[in-house]
Amino acid sequence: LIRRQRQMCIRDRCLDSWLYDDMQPFMHVEALDTYRFLREQVETGYFETLIEKYLLHNPHASVVVIEPERGLNAKREETLAEKLAAYKDSLSKEEIKQLIADTKHLKQYQEEPSPKEDLAKIPMLKREDMKREAAPLYNTMKKCGDTTVVHHEMFSNGIDYLRILFDIRDMEIKDLPYVGILKYILGYMDTERYGFSELANEINIHTGGISASCGVYPHVKKPEDMQFMFELRVKTLASELPQAMDLLREIIMTTKISDEKRLSEIIAQLRSRVEAAFDGSGHSVASMRALSYFSRAAYYQEATAGISFYELVADLDEHFNEKKDALIAQLEKMVQTIFVPERMIVSVVCEEADYQAVEAQIAFLLKNLYPSKEIVKERSLPELHLEKKNEGFMDASQVQYVARAGNYVRHGFSYHGALRILKVIMGYDYLWINVRVKGGAYGCMNSYMRNGDTYFVSYRDPNLKKTDEIYDGIPVSYTHLRAHETLSDL
């Protein structure tokens, strides 16, 4: 995955210059001379001059203030209705008839399939262009004491990639949203040795980033089973690994969660970020919420990053003074419960020559975690009651995100590679034509996961009921589907 990401990054950099000069595809890839020049300028005042000239003393500047206005959408709709009514009144009967005829012609055009000759012009891969063999896995199971380490040996250009996972599948259901909060505060509060801004500088100096997240890993053959992990990710040069791991220890063990002022700031920032994320990814929010009605994996994701999570964050933001003591106590207890050696698993991407040094740093971290308060041979998932709610949520947007979800494994079916093909066909055929082209939505998606979880969702959709009716028509549309070599043959 890392190698593929690097290749994609290089490809995109090539396009940045190649688009404008056929003879310069590698301009932004061949960057060593540029970095060498920049390093030479560190002590010369070069960067300070740039900041002074182009930022501090730049005469070209703008200040933009955006203020909310209650009822603005209603005013805009009223203005539009008046404008359209005035336009209609200005038309003659013949012009109205022509407008109706043009609209019918447009709908007919949208419903007509593209000619095969036009579709044949689209470049396509042939069967012989694709490998039948799966990409090789570079997984070697190792041990550091009693801790499992999965080593992915591959060329990494001198960079070590570590994912440090803590098994929290036994976390109580009521505590799940607080796990979501914990991942946002680690690395953003004062620690024993650093203020939060100094900590950010140290992270930037010694690493390519330290981040926290929650990982949900459904069981492929058992939809009701899964693993739930708290994950810490570190990317750093091999030579900087000791400093990086010491920073990680500092964050895990000495974060000052009891700093009420900073915690209040983070909660307020978090609320704003989640709201902004919802505005841009309503399709993900809708599909996750729909899946959470019956899928434990989706329920956990929703509780730590979805609407349920947002509701807790908003409540804490509005009533911080009343709830701060309980929040701090909850987070401090959670830190001591999660970060113990018995829960830890490590995934490492590095070259073989660097592995021993990595293992030594893993051992260092293990020695500096909290001691276990109890010995548990096998952690189990808590009891969870799932409920189909069929909800709708309103916001200030003028568009909608309409989702339907289900699980085909629970209905006796099993995963098959053909579902990958169905996803493409449906995304560019039935859903594309009906939801996007005819319905006016900006996009439409569908997904079929290995554990059976499935969803359809529209993106920036002006319709609700109409889109839901389109989902109803999916079974009929594909009952008699015949497989052909290309989509143009369908």
Residue ranges and their predicted role:
Residues 68-73:
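Terminal amphipathic helices with adjacent charged low-complexity linkers/tails
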